[in-house]
Amino acid sequence: MIIRHAFTGWPGSTHDARVLRQSSLYDIGENSNKIGPNKYLIADSAYPLFEWLITPFRDNGRLNQGQRRFNRVLSSCRQVVERCIGHLKGRLRRLRGITLHIIENIVQNIVSGCILHNLCVLRNDNVERFTEEPDDDPNQYPNIFNPAQTGMDKRQQIVNNLP
C-alpha cells in the first residue's frame, strides 16, 4: 500500500471535490494521457464522476442488481485506501490530530509522514498492531454532482464486465 500521490494544504472542512479540482491529479486526469484509456482511479461519492475517476452509483432506492454489485465491489476496493490511511495514522500518530498552526509545517508533516510510510512498506515493516479501522459507512456522502457522460459510460462498462 504505497502512497503514490498526496495533495495537502487545504483545511479538512473543504469539500473533497473542491480539493480535487485544485490538485495536480485533476490536471493529470483531465489534460493528459497518463492515466490511460483502460485505466481509472476510484473514489467515493464525495467526488465527481469522470472517465478517469469512477465513483459509486447514487443509491436512490432504484439501483438494479448490477449497479448494487458494482457499488459493493467499488467499496471493497476503496477499503484498501482506507486501510492505507489507517496504517499511515497508526505508524505516525502525530498525523491523527495535527495541532500545528503554521500551514507550511502541517503540509511538511503530512508529506514527510507519507514518505516515511512508504519507506516502512518497502522494508516490510509490520504495522497491523497500529492500524485504525476504516469508517463503517463506505458511501457516506450523497453524490451531488452531475456526472460526465464519459464517466457514466466507463462505469457502465465496468458493471457489464463484472462476473
Over which residues does each language-model region extend?
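Short, well-ordered secondary-structure "scaffold" segments embedded in the functional core
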Residues: 1-163
